[in-house]
Amino acid sequence: MSDIFPESHPEHPLNLIPELCRKFYDLGWATGTGGGISIKMGENYYIAPSGVQKERIMPNEIFVLNASQDVVEEPRTEKQLKISECTPLFFNAYRLRGAGACLHTHSANCVLISLLCDREFRISHIEMIKGIINNETKKALGFRDTLVVPIIENTDFEKDLTASMAECMVRYPESCAVLVRRHGMYVWSDTWQKAKGAVECIDYLMGLAIRMRTLGLEWEPKGAK
């Protein structure tokens, strides 16, 4: 069960989502109004608005939803904000994985990897793999384990990814992430801390894999110890 914080607490989703959006923007993961973040606390689901400058989101601009995906609290602002286009995809993670947070990035590394791979991104024998949790066993992957991130095809509208993402999550029960070709990536976990750690590790591994490819190095080295 997630901790319940007062609105004044820095880890309350109303404060945490804007902070994480700024960090994602600085990393190039949420530029041009792209990307999104959702965090669950108690019975409520907090979601950043759509089509706004992610580095400038304020606590009073967050939507609050219930488990039925109904908005129970509108942003406390006069701005005419629209709920994130990612909302039904975030709820895939909540409903199918019991996640506590789901993060969506438009990282260039994710897009490039989706172009280099067919149906999956696979990599092993890299230390940062240890920072990713097997979604089924809830245990961290080991150095010799293979990280597998499945890839789905992009659509014209974000909401139209909902069904294919859900089907992919069923086919890959161990994965905590789904790549969307030519688009970005969704990552989830039990807590926002674990989801943040996972997306950082996966993006690092993807960036490394791109460089390895230019050097002729294998992502899954045969006979490696």
From Swiss-Prot:
Annotated positions binding substrate: C86
Enzyme Commission number(s) of this protein: 4.2.1.109
Active-site residues from the entry: E127 (proton donor/acceptor)
Cofactor(s) it depends on: Zn(2+)
CC annotations in GO: cytoplasm
Bound cofactor: record note: Binds 1 zinc ion per subunit.
Superkingdom of this protein's organism: Eukaryota
Subcellular location, principal: cytoplasm
One biological process term in Gene Ontology: L-methionine salvage from methylthioadenosine
Top-rank EC class of the record's enzyme: lyase
Entry binding sites for Zn(2+): H104, H106, H183
GO molecular function: methylthioribulose 1-phosphate dehydratase activity; zinc ion binding
Pathway(s) the chain acts in: Amino-acid biosynthesis; L-methionine biosynthesis via salvage pathway; L-methionine from S-methyl-5-thio-alpha-D-ribose 1-phosphate: step 2/6
Keywords, ordered alphabetically: Amino-acid biosynthesis, Cytoplasm, Lyase, Metal-binding, Methionine biosynthesis, Zinc
Keyword rRNA processing included in the entry's annotation: no
Localization: Cytoplasm
Record's catalysed reaction(s): 5-(methylsulfanyl)-D-ribulose 1-phosphate = 5-methylsulfanyl-2,3-dioxopentyl phosphate + H2O
InterPro entries: Aldolase_II/adducin_N (IPR001303), Aldolase_II/adducin_N_sf (IPR036409), MethylthioRu-1-P_deHdtase_MtnB (IPR017714), Salvage_MtnB_euk (IPR027514)
HAMAP family recorded: Salvage_MtnB_euk (MF_03116)
Function: Catalyzes the dehydration of methylthioribulose-1-phosphate (MTRu-1-P) into 2,3-diketo-5-methylthiopentyl-1-phosphate (DK-MTP-1-P).
Family statement drawn from the similarity comment of this UniProt entry: Belongs to the aldolase class II family. MtnB subfamily.
Protein name: Probable methylthioribulose-1-phosphate dehydratase
Organism: Leishmania infantum
